[in-house]
């Protein structure tokens, strides 16, 4: 019995470190996962650095800002942005693996998993398309894509269209605001008529008015400024109504 115990202990001591070392060596030599990437030397654009400089100047107690503070703030801000970028890729990679795993199951399994795990479908879908676009890009454009507003990248990744045109938008990015970039993406990649995401501006406006009226219905009183704004809005709506229904008495 003693010999058996000694034999088992010696085998355990012999094999366990070997497995641990093999796993560590695999990580060090480079796991094929595309996400053992780049938290090295994160940087901000000159525009972002200038925005942080203005922030320190605005909230500074002294006349001059401390340059070491600005340098550290820029470094930390760049690291935070890259950590967020890295987390999106990690989500996207796992979601892709789950989608592949559930392909052999009945339709709806993947959607149910998204709802069970994330509570909605839109957030993980954004992660998924972001990851898919990122993995298709050449290395220099991956760096440029990281600099773009996240919402703009989600929109670009989700649109149907040539990969070359998507790469061109990323290549030509020059620090534009999110709204400008979204306008360009929507112009280059318009939604098809059958796309459920396509909503007419009129429907959007009516939905906002409906929501606003529901909120106002619950109000018991308005301030004088709010009354003035509401009266102006009612007059504008009356004008819209008379233009759309000219034969209807207001």
UniProtKB/Swiss-Prot annotation:
Top-rank taxon, per record: Bacteria
Family annotation (InterPro entries): UPF0137
Family recorded in the similarity comment: Belongs to the UPF0137 (pGP6-D) family.
Protein's name in the database: Virulence plasmid protein pGP6-D-related protein
